[in-house]
Structures are given as structure tokens and as C-alpha cells.
Amino acid sequence: MKVGIGLPSAVSPPDGRVVIEWAAAAEQAGFASVAVIDRLLAPTYDPLTVLAAAAAVTERAGLYTSVMLTPLRPVAVVASQAATVDQLSGGRLSLGVAVGSRRPDYAAVGVPFERRGRVLDAQLAGLRRAWAEPDGFTAAGPVPRTPGGPPILLGGTSPAAVRRVAQHGCGWICGLGGAAGFAPMAETVRDRWHQAGRDGAPRLLSIVNFALGPRAAEVSASFLRRYYGAAPFVEAMVRGTATTLSQVRAELDAHRQAGCDEVLLFPCAADLSQLELAAETL
């Protein structure tokens, strides 16, 4: 099982120098990938812009959006930006996408909240069409370095999210519940994948939030409550955050036993010491 790490691009206020330093240090420390999360109405960096910067200071690490709320953006823009990052990185991008749960974000861009799932369905088909052109550029920008486009991973636990994995995706990202939440949903995803007649197996990833060192529990709770606001799952995220090295190791072991392909450790603080401590679990 691989272990990647999130970049502190959402830890408020984000610092560009720190984010880029994290990306370079993550690869040097042995993490398999770096990842970013996404919000619109928040003091956070744009996910694909961050990954373009990360691509410039890394050579091997995978680059993940985990996840990007693509229904908030025109599909042609997503296709062009993702293809650009894939080209700049030499084919290291994996595009994790989901619909999100924040009504104000959708109101800000004029997309009806109730239609966000249907918008994503249309986008998934549109991305593949945009990336299928044989020439160097499509109507939506450059052709990706990866033939057919970057792997698309779906976030979410609804029946619709699982359906999208089987119909359009290369895999699934678990965003809630740690290993205890990952294991049963992973089995559901695998079953739906095979029912759809897909070959092989879906890629299965999971996010584990962490904070380490003095006041780790306080720091992580403050960040998660501030970032996610009144979302109904926030307190469960707070309780599930790993705040000691032994808890991080336990989560990694449990995910490994459940058949996870890669765990993404997401920091709740931006100090580089967080990455250095997390690297002790590799």
C-alpha cells in the first residue's frame, strides 16, 4: 500500500512558499504522492494551480485532487487545466472529483445545487471526449500526457457516487470514517464495479486527517471546524483525526488489511514538522 500526503493549501491562511516546500519535502521523505482538497468560498488555493506548482518541484510523486468540486467549473476549463497539469508533470495527475455539499459554493457560480449530480455526470463524459482527440490540442486545450486523460477517481458514499465509479471512473476515494468507514464502502465499490462488467479492480484510496505534536487534538479540531463549518460530518471528522504517531500507524495498518491501495494523510497544520513527523510512519 502506498502512502501520500496532503499539501497545506487549505490551512488558513495558506502560504505559497510553505506549500511548495511541502511538495518538495514530501517526495524527498518518500511519500508516494501529494494531494490537495478544494473549496470555492474559502481562503484556499485553487487545486490544479497548486498541483502545477508541485509538479515543478517534484519528479516522481503522484499528484491528486482529492477531491475537486468540478461542477463548480465549466467542463472545458477543467479539461484544459487538468490536461495542462498532466503535461507539465509528465503524466502524474490523478483527478479526484465529487459534488460537495455546500450550497453557497453553487449559488456563487449559478449552478443549481439540486442539479450538481447531473452536472457531474455530464462532465465525466465530457472530459473523456475532450481528452480523446489525437492531435496536440483539442477544443478544450492540450491533450493530456496520459493517453485518454488522467485517471478519474470519484469521491462520495451515495449510490450515485458508487455508480459513477463503475461507469466513468478508475477508482474511489474515501473521505470520511478512516479505515472503519473505508472497508464496507470499498466492498460495495468492488461489487458494483464487477456488476458493471469492468475488468480488473478499482483503485481504492482513503483520506486520513492528522495532526501531531503538542496540542494536536486542539489544533486539528480548530482547523476542521473552521474549514468545514456546520457540515453534519464535522464532529465525526474531529473524532476520527489521528493525533499521535501510533494512531497514524494503526490507521495505515487497518487500511492495508482492508485492501486499500493508497492512503492520503492530510495535515491540519502547515508547519513542516508535521510532514517530518508523519514520515516516521513510512
Would you name each region that the model predicts?
Residues 1-282:
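Active-site-adjacent structural elements that line small-molecule/cofactor binding pockets in enzymes
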